[in-house]
Amino acid sequence: MHRATESARPDAVFRDPLAERLAGDHGRAIVDHVPRTTRNGWWLVARTKIIDDAIAEAIAQGCDRVLNLAAGLDTRPYRLNLPPDLTWVEADLPALLAEKTQVLADEVPRCRLTRTAVDLADAAARDAFLNEALDGATKALVLTEGLLMYLDDSDVSALSAALQRPEVRWWMLDFAGPGLKKMMNKKMAGMLANAPFKFAPDNGLAYFENLGWRTVQVEALYSAARRLRRLPLVMRPLGWL
């Protein structure tokens, strides 16, 4: 719903014409029950724009495939300026992908879009999916937007190992720190009861560097939100940190 709200602004930083259709009444109900400080979705707007720009930059550098793991209601294949011959693969649970495919049945993606139903928590199923999805790729970007914070440390480590293969050039991810994890699990205890924040490494980016990854670009959400003029007034001092 936050993407739909942003898209309706005259100064929108991105346009997602399909967001409202996908969110529906359920999405509006969720927004109505979140804490007031996060209700305007500044963090989601910032994250969306950061990832949009990172994908565009990767494509300019020769990215030939995008894998969106736990793709959810993402509509980038329909709204970004993408090469028609780019292969974009969405992976998520069967029921979610089936509903999404039905809702978007009359829409045409701007690239070669495929969807694969897979339980990414199943190591064998995940590896089989990656083998198929990355076949023929040479510079793939893997996106795990809004996923890692719900995983255990061991699951993140296993996913990292699975993605360390020659076809993968970039891993675009987001994660929270221990302080945000504690605050979110407390403020949104009811909403997060079935999916609490779990992964929040004490050592931040060093966690991934210790697993063999090299940091190319990083930006805090509050910093991006301030740059985009979306950070709530009460939080603006954070943008200077």
Please report, for each region that a protein language model flagged, where it lies by residue.
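Rossmann-like AdoMet
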Residues: 1-67, 71-118, 123-132, 136
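Short acidic, glycine/proline-enriched helix-loop-strand junctions
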Residues: 81-87, 191-194, 213
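A short, conserved alpha-helix within the catalytic core of class I
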Residues: 113-115, 123-126, 150-166
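A short SAM/SAH-binding and catalytic strip from SAM-dependent methyltransferases
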Residues: 138-154
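Conserved beta-strand signature within the Rossmann-like core of class I S-adenosyl-L-methionine
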Residues: 141-143, 159-179
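Short, glycine-/aromatic-enriched active-site segment of Class I SAM-dependent methyltransferases
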Residues: 178-195
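Short alpha-helix
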Residues: 195-223
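Conserved catalytic loop of SAM-dependent methyltransferase domains
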Residues: 216-239
